[in-house]
């Protein structure tokens, strides 16, 4: 059985594969704008560092349609987030400094879609990431915090990222990063056992699950039962070979979708990602959504 795609498969629809931001929807399959997003007029600014764009060149930084995400446009476009802690870098990432008309400076960090599944999903054309300023996120499989740091930028000082990582080595890097980013709460625990960290995590708006484990769907559903608000949302990264390398990736995706549906996790969109890894997909959806 093939995994659900646009226009079939119980309402789960595939992305349209656009690398641009804009108003176009990954579900609707129609483009209604460019990278500048909805309605907010960008200002032309000047770059003061390379940041993926040649230093000193004129750069146009515009809001992406996903709140808290931006696009720096020049000879080479780059996905960026506004640095929550100006002056601090996480992984020697490139930065772009732009000067506003009032002479204030804003610092942006370049977000590489080849290193982050969430960034890859955005450039592929996901309809909604549900992560936006002010929300609370539970991130399972935080690793050393590359994507977590950009999620931290997006949710801002009013939001919060609970970052769960099992590896002590990655956990140390994650904790060092969180010293400056006060909206990141590192939790060095096994995501398979949420009862161990239930006293540290409040109810969240979205769970982002990037746990490379054969039981990853069950891990997500168990954490959702503890922490995800009814009507909240989720994203799960599925690496087919980690679940069953003996069958077709499409079959694996369908099996995982069916597991999620059994646990009140309703998938609404599936994207095949190529930038990070082969045979990899991300499923987005909602939890205990009201029936239409």
Swiss-Prot record:
GO terms for biological process: methylation; rRNA processing. Residues 7-42 have a biased composition (Gly residues). Keywords: Methyltransferase, Nucleus, Ribonucleoprotein, RNA-binding, rRNA processing, S-adenosyl-L-methionine, Transferase. InterPro entries: Fibrillarin, SAM-dependent_MTases_sf. It is found in: Nucleus, Nucleolus. Its EC number is 2.1.1.-. Not detectable by RT-PCR. S-adenosyl-L-methionine binds at residues 146-147, 165-166, 190-191, 210-213. GO terms for cellular component: nucleolus; ribonucleoprotein complex. It comes from the Eukaryota. GO terms for molecular function: methyltransferase activity; RNA binding. This is Putative rRNA 2'-O-methyltransferase fibrillarin 3. It comes from Arabidopsis thaliana. The gene is FIB3.
């Amino acid at each position: 059985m093939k995994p659900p795609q646009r226009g079939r498969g119980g309402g789960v629809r595939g992305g349209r594969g656009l690398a641009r931001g804009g108003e176009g929807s990954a579900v609707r399959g129609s483009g209604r704008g460019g990278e500048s997003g909805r309605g907010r007029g960008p200002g032309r600014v000047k770059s003061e560092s390379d940041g993926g764009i040649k230093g000193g060149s004129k750069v146009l930084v515009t809001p992406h349609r996903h709140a808290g995400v931006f696009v720096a446009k020049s000879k080479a476009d780059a996905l960026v987030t506004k640095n929550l802690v100006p002056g601090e870098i996480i992984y020697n990432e490139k930065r772009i400094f732009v000067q506003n008309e009032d002479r204030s400076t804003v610092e942006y960090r370049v977000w590489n879609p080849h290193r982050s599944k969430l960034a890859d999903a955005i450039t592929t054309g996901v309809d909604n990431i549900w992560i936006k300023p002010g929300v609370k996120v539970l991130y399972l499989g935080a690793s050393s915090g590359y994507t977590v740091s950009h999620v931290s930028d997006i949710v801002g000082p009013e939001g919060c990222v609970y970052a769960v990582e099992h590896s002590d080595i990655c956990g140390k890097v994650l904790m060092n990063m969180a010293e400056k980013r006060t909206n990141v709460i590192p939790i060095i625990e096994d995501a398979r056992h949420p009862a161990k960290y239930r006293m540290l995590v409040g109810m969240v708006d979205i769970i982002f699950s990037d746990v490379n484990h054969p039981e990853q769907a069950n891990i997500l559903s168990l954490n959702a039962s503890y922490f995800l608000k009814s009507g909240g949302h989720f994203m799960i990264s599925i690496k087919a070979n980690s679940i069953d390398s003996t069958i077709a990736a499409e079959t694996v995706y369908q099996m995982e979708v069916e597991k999620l549906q059994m646990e009140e996790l309703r998938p609404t969109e599936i994207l095949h990602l190529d930038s990070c890894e082969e045979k990899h997909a991300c499923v987005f959806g909602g939890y205990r959504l009201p029936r239409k």
